[in-house]
Amino acid sequence: MPDATPQFKQQLREAFDSLQVGQIFTYRRTFTEGDVSLFIGVTGDLNPYHQDEMFAGESWFKRRNIPGLLTASMATHIGGMMGFLATEMTFQYLKPVYVGDTVTCVVTVMEKDDEKRQFFCAVNYTNQDGMEVLKGGFRGFPSDVRLAK
């Protein structure tokens, strides 16, 4: 593998220096049937809780819910805007999310490791009713100076 160019190394330094502990990035979206269909098609997640209204209706969910990783993937939108490459991601699913729900994803830069040139970010997801539906975190490094505002 070839060595990184001096220009790329400088770009990484600038990206690292531009992120600070305490910075917050937010992304909001309303999930649609199309989102679920595309996600199921790409992942092959054929879980009846996501596809079968009758099956899900007889469960404690009372109706179909969207795949948890679809909700969790909102963090990748923010990470992409930050030019962030994750090395680790963890999630805790707290409440179901349904088609039509509007979810807000908030990423907070929590730790900056100057030695490893990595960050740890906390991520929290709330629905339109202000209920926390998912939480987690990710670790990695910025690769670009593009920052979500």
Residue ranges and their predicted role:
Residues 2-85, 146-149:
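Hot-dog-fold acyl-thioester-processing enzymes
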Residues 81-105:
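Mid-chain, well-packed structural core segment of small domains
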Residues 1-21, 97-149:
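HotDog/MaoC-like acyl-thioester-processing domains
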Residues 75, 93, 107-109:
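Conserved hydrophobic positions within beta-strands
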